[in-house]
């Protein structure tokens, strides 16, 4: 079962010391332990605008993230709070509170943009917190960070000036939730009441025209529209009387403005129900461990002066996870074989059957824990390792069988060898007695269980090594005529040749069996690779269809908003005309 992490308080995830970013290892360890999918909500905005208050509410607490009550910025770097998702079982809600932008104590805004960019890259829902109204400054700031040619790269391409496919680019970005604090304006456009979402869409609507002034006005709006096809806007009244704002986090709800309390409730409800699980290109679901790796990749890139590249981050993540998936698969194989196999195995087929079962389970473990292994390089690596494992277990089985059989022969034939040394068979009729005893001991050897596949091989080698002993006894046997001795020698030779032929035939059968097993393994690997490829292609198709549906929905929403705006303009124009009509008296 996926592990659920409970953090009683937030902690720093990315430290910002002297405008240098550094990852907090303790926070990374917490992320590593989260095996559940994560919903990542990050908030960014100017300092002293109440970001931390909203994040505390999302955590279901009044206190946690530092809420400032002075003109200095409190939160430094990026802080994290992992809590159980209130709506989705087996999901973890990861809240990221960021250092306030625009701190006058900073030398320039480079550090601000780095923190802004990290929040964008890590989140599945990005909360942009501004004050009073949507103005050009807020739009320009959001545009400056989201513009790929300035800071973010979707692909690892040297051509940073090429135009990105809007659907492709948008898939890398989170959903946008724009929060307007201390909103005191009327939600009205051209005399018509509008919703916060309509107010946002109107603020981002480009103007008609082609002169430079219009282009400068439209560029950031088009960029935001492209990168954030899914947008939501919330407005918040002033929470309480000015004198009480310094104690905002300690004020009970009944001392806050009712409208503000209701607005915060609606905001939290929307985040809980609409914020999606963090996913990467290709539909890769992010858990705590993957989020940790993304943090490391992005911070290292920014700290080294490189552009954070989403494709590189995904590839680096795939490298780490697929390499770990290979190790998990091999560990599972070793565990299963260790439990099932007792060397020596009686037959090669029995051993190969156990290998085949453990191999299939190992591949399933790999497929479950790997992702984006597009060229199957890691699966091929696993197959190479499994092939080596098969060769090794077969070799060890041979050695175990040989060792066991050698020890068994020593135990069974030891008394006979001692009798030969004492000259018991060096007498008339001794050779027949020796052969008779040898056959009895061979029968005893054959009756012993669990000798393994080297039983005949080891026996024949042993008997061959004792041919000189048999020949010496035969030569000293005075009871046999010369003709009988030659006949005996021919008989012994024929039996030895027959045994050698049987030994070679057994080796040939084993080799053929191993070749057939390797061919079967190859065909199974090809089949598994084809399944993995088809699954990946199906996932890509699913993602493309989902993107097209989202684009269509966005276009429909935009079209409807434009129609409403046009209708409002027409109605306003009609009222103006009616008001200007002259009154004619007859």
UniProtKB/Swiss-Prot annotation:
Isoprenylation is required for proper subcellular location. Residues 1-306 are annotated as: NLRP3-binding. It comes from the Eukaryota. Its EC number is 3.6.5.-. It is an enzyme of class 3 (hydrolase). A lipid is attached at residue 583 (S-geranylgeranyl cysteine). GTP binds at residues 45-52, 67-69, 181-182, 245. Residues 35-276 form the GB1/RHD3-type G domain. It is a lipid-anchor; GPI-like-anchor. It catalyses: GTP + H2O = GDP + phosphate + H(+). InterPro entries: G_GB1_RHD3_dom, GBP_C, Guanylate-bd/ATL_C, Guanylate-bd_C_sf, Guanylate-bd_N, P-loop_NTPase. GO terms for biological process: activation of innate immune response; cellular response to lipopolysaccharide; cellular response to type II interferon; cytolysis in another organism; defense response to bacterium; defense response to virus; inflammatory response; positive regulation of AIM2 inflammasome complex assembly. GO terms for cellular component: cytoplasm; cytoplasmic vesicle; cytoplasmic vesicle membrane; Golgi apparatus; Golgi membrane; membrane; perinuclear region of cytoplasm; side of membrane. Residues 584-586 form a propeptide. One of its GO terms (molecular function) is protein homodimerization activity. Induction: By IFNG in endothelial cells and in LPS-primed macrophages. Expressed in peripheral blood monocytes (at protein level). It is found in: Cytoplasmic vesicle membrane; Golgi apparatus membrane; Cytoplasm. The modification Cysteine methyl ester is found at residue 583. Belongs to the TRAFAC class dynamin-like GTPase superfamily. GB1/RHD3 GTPase family. GB1 subfamily. Homodimer; homodimerizes upon GTP-binding, forming a close face-to-face dimer. Heterodimer with other family members, including GBP1, GBP2, GBP3 and GBP4. May also form tetramers (dimer of dimers) in the presence of GTP. Interacts with NLRP3, possibly in its tetrameric form, and promotes PYCARD/ASC polymerization. This is Guanylate-binding protein 5. The lineage of its organism: Eukaryota, Metazoa, Chordata, Craniata, Vertebrata.
